[in-house]
């Protein structure tokens, strides 16, 4: 959570610096700020606004503003895609990219040579983890599988899942996120990619940025100010700020829920009044933002914290969150020591491993966290039988639950074990293809790759039909069976 907030702090600072030139703003600031800390000043200003917005608004306002902000973001995404398509013809794309760029296939190495077209990009890619593409994809796939097995991340994603009325609604909400978000997101991303091609190929952008030693992470706001008309630029800026506010608000709003409910009320002040809980939530929100802001001052760039979050921190927490669903013996001590060992190892790795290699150390982090989980689990007794049986009946999980399943069936003969593992794994495979198509379709649409667009749309339609019969219909049927079971055994 702190890592994500630091990521947003650095990003919003660099982004807004382009739109609000320091030469103009500095006239109204009563103190001198070194040039290298100007993005941090902007970051502090906008995160402070967002923090008060979260504290004063609460959960309901965050939900409704999320809806409004998404609509703004969708319009902005469509606009930027249209602008990019009007400025860059398909022939220009083919002239700009090197051989092999259009192919989805690759070997152990990426083998795409940008040296003749954009030598500075070749130098930048040497510092990224993508050269050994085969290993990178294997590590990313391995991490993705375990992240999926871990269920919703223990942040605002979990809050949104738990706020749904039923398992069916939770599943539909989770699935609809891909449909709603991916298409406008990648329309905007590919629109900016086309504008970048125009910038580098037609407007001599490489020479301009090299001459003034421009940070490549600020290309996006440069493109907006250079190619987007004034009125639309305002809309786009509002859309991107909306995306920041939405993510920032949801992340900050999750922190008080965990700290106040799981620590303050449980161990410090169980009888706290509602007013006291609200004040504690305000304090936690401010502390989380302050700590993440301080962390942001020690980061070199956005990519640095991004690589650490997706490669190291995720690797540190995944093991504990996988085991909590799939192993009956797992307990609170195992979760604590697994999370602690994983996060501590991730922090150590932050200072000992180059950022470009973090993802390759995912198995190491996962192994350290897994050992912490197992040692912590056997250092304490298992959860009480009532809790385990109740969890098994309500969740019906996969994995190593045989002793608990036997007790649940003995107590409630109507209960049956989850025997749909093969069907669910088939749905996972189809779902991966379906979600990839949702990503690829807007990309092919913007670059006008007719063959790829037709193929991906057809594949999207086929996988949607398959999921209707193998996922949605069983979901509806099993929802009714679940409700009837809960009534029969008196757990409704």
Task: Please give the residue ranges for each predicted region.
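Helix-loop-helix module between adjacent transmembrane segments
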Residues: 1-55, 125, 140-150, 242-250
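Transmembrane helix-loop junctions in multi-pass membrane proteins
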Residues: 4-25, 53-60, 191, 199-201, ...
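Central hydrophobic cores of alpha-helical transmembrane segments
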Residues: 73, 77, 334-345, 390-392, ...
